[in-house]
């Protein structure tokens, strides 16, 4: 999982990427390509 300041550019890397909020943190998740996981930090 990558830790990035801005997730907007990471979301555009794959069409299945989703931005979700969990426990006050913002994540990019992808059900089909797991390597696109990222967290904002």
Curated annotation (Swiss-Prot):
Family membership noted in the UniProt record: Belongs to the bacterial ribosomal protein bL36 family.
Organism whose genome encodes this protein: Methylobacterium nodulans (strain LMG 21967 / CNCM I-2342 / ORS 2060)
Molecular function terms from GO: structural constituent of ribosome
Pfam families: Ribosomal_L36
Protein name: Large ribosomal subunit protein bL36
One example of a Gene Ontology biological process annotation: translation
GO cellular component entries: ribonucleoprotein complex; ribosome
InterPro entries, per the entry: Ribosomal_bL36, Ribosomal_bL36_sp, Ribosomal_L36_bact
Keyword Ribonucleoprotein among UniProt keywords: yes
Coiled-coil residues: none
UniProt keyword terms in alphabetical order: Ribonucleoprotein, Ribosomal protein
